Amino acid sequence: MAGGIKVSVWSAVGPGPRCWGAGGGGGATWLLLVVAGCVVCGSADVNVVMLQESQVDMNSSQQFCYKNVLIPKWHDIWTRIQVRVNSSKLVRVTQVDNEEKLKELEQFSIWNFFSSFLKEKLNDTYVNVGLYSTKTCLKVEMIEKDTTYSVTVTRRFDPKLFLVFLLGLTLFFCGDLLSRSQIFYYSTGMSVGIVASLLIVIFMISKFMPKRSPIYVILVGGWSFSLYLIQLVFKNLQEIWRSYWHYLLSYILTVGFMSFAVCYKYGPLENERSINLLTWTLQLLGLGLMYSSIQIPHVAFALIVIALCTKNLEYPIHWLCSTYRRMCKASGKPVPPRLLTEEEYRIQGEVETQKALQELREFCNSPECSAWKTISRIQSPKRFADFVEGSFHLTPNEVSVHEQEYGLGSIFTQDEELSSEEEGSEYPTFTQNNFLT
C-alpha cells in the first residue's frame, strides 16, 4: 500500500523468463518506475505551524503558514510584512502560496529534486508578504543536524520603500534637468560600469562575434550567469565588504576610473532627440519606482495620475492665464496713451536722430550700398563722404539758420507777441518755456 493504492510487483520479481530486458535488469527498472509513480501520486499529511506576529523557535525541519487577516488602510502604503528566518547554520527556505503547494513539496518529483540543488542555502533570509496576500506558506529544511532557527513575523513601516518612492518622484519631476546634467551623466556611467562590468564585457565580446555563430549560446549563458552573480553579490554585500574590503575597494576604484574614461571620451549627450529619450526613460523609471514602492495598488495608481497631472499642469495654467488677460483687455475700457512732455520729446528726438544717422553710416560702409549710384544722385559728394567718415551732418550755416527759426531768439519773439495781445486782459498770462528749464 502506497498512499492508498495497491501495487502488484509479482510480474517484476517472479520466476520464469521475461522479455523486458537483457539479463532481467528491465524488471527492476519497471519496479522502480512504478514505485516512483505511486510516490508522486500519493499524498502525505503535512504538519503546518500557523505563524502570528511573534517569534517561533524550532530545531527541526518544519512547514509554516501565515494568514493575513488585517485589511490594508491608506496609511499602510509603506508598510511591509516580512517573515524572517534566522538560523545558527545554513538552512533552505522555500516559499509557496498555500498548504496544497506544501504537500506537493513533500512528494517526490524530478523537478523538486533538481530545484533543491539550485535553491540558496542561507542562515538569515527574509520572505516578503503582500498586504493583499491572504496566506503565505514556507518550508524550512535543515541541511545539518543540531541546527536551531527562529521564525519571526513583523509588520512595520519600511523606510526603504519611502526612499524608493522619493527617488522615483525625483526622477520623474527632475528627469529633464538630470538628462542635461554632466554630474548625473558621469555618476550614472561610473555606477553602471561598477555594477554591470561583467555584462558590459559580454556585450563587447558579442560585437566581435560572427552572425549565426554557436558562441551566442555561451553568451546567453554568460548573461544569465552575470545577472545571478550580481544578485548574489548584493545579497552578501555586507559580508563581502567585511572580509574582502581591500579587493572590493580596488575593484571599485579601477572599474570606476575606466568607466569615467569611457564617459569622458564620448562626452555628455548633445543631440536633442537623445536628451528627450533619456528624459522619457528617467520619467518612466521614476513612475515604475513610485508604483513598486507603494504597497496599495489603487493608491499607487492615484499618486501616479496626480504626478502626471502636476507635471503637465503648467501648460493649461499658462493657457488659462493668457485667455484671462485677453478677456480683461477686451472687456475693459481703452486706456488713452500718455502724451510726451516737451523735454521728453526733445530728448527722444535727439536719441532717435543720432541712432538713425549711425545706421545710415553703417549702411553706406556696407557692401550692399552702391557708392557710385549714390554719389551720382547727391549735390555735394565731398560733404557726403565726410559724413560717412564721421563728420557732423550739418554745416555751421545750417545750424545758425535753425537757431534763428527754432532757437532762443524765435522763442523771445513769440513771447513778446503773446504779451502784447494779452495786455488788455485782467490777469496777465505767464508763459513757461520748458526748453529753459
Curated annotation (Swiss-Prot):
Residues making up the signal peptide according to the UniProt record: 1-44
Annotated glycosylation sites: 123
Region (Required for nuclear localization): 334-437
Location in or out of the cell: Nucleus inner membrane; Nucleus envelope
Statement: the UniProt record of this protein carries the keyword Signal: yes
Record InterPro entries: NEMP_fam (IPR019358)
Post-translational modification: Phosphorylated. Phosphorylation may regulate its interaction with RAN-GTP.
Region (B): 334-403
Biased composition (Polar residues): 428-437
Effect of residue 420 to A/E: Partial loss of phosphorylation and loss of interaction with RAN-GTP
Effect on the protein upon substituting residue 419 to A/E: Partial loss of phosphorylation and loss of interaction with RAN
Notes on the domains: The transmembrane domains are required and sufficient for its oligomerization.
Role of this protein: Together with EMD, contributes to nuclear envelope stiffness in germ cells. Required for female fertility. Essential for normal erythropoiesis. Required for efficient nuclear envelope opening and enucleation during the late stages of erythroblast maturation.
Family: Belongs to the NEMP family.
Record's protein name: Nuclear envelope integral membrane protein 1
Organism: Mus musculus
Gene: Nemp1
